[in-house]
Amino acid sequence: MKLDIYLNYNGNCEQAFRFYEQHLGGKITMMMTHGEQPNQTNVPANWKQAILHARIEIGKTVLMGADVPGAEPMRSAYLTLRLDSDEEADRLYALLADGGQIFMKMEETFFASRFAMLRDKFGTSWMHPPRPPTFSAARPMLLSMEPASRFVFGTV
């Protein structure tokens, strides 16, 4: 079994995927507009350029998306970037935070040399731990977060 991710955008799917392709090293393998589908009978003229389906591969992850009328930013899920260096974490944090909303600025934590949480300008929520975190049995671990200002802790 393989689990892929499907994101809904409110008219900016193409811009988001092109941005991710350029800055996250992804490769767009499919992008179709509503105007390119075979039967366009029910497609409003102002929606023909909207993305019906897009697919991008980022590393070993497949991310799919579409423009959906009335789509809202992600609120209860985060895409997580596991990066190889603090420098790469800082670079991508700056790019994804530009025009977005920062929930937790990039900083050192008890579990990572760099960690951040944000929503980019396209409405996608991201977490940035540079490397997979390691926890000792006695240290607290962040279990869940929603809304962003309320943390729930446990131990591992």
Annotate each PLM feature.
Residues 3, 29-32, 50, 57, ...:
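Vicinal oxygen chelate
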Residues 7-60, 142-156:
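Core segments of cupin and vicinal oxygen chelate
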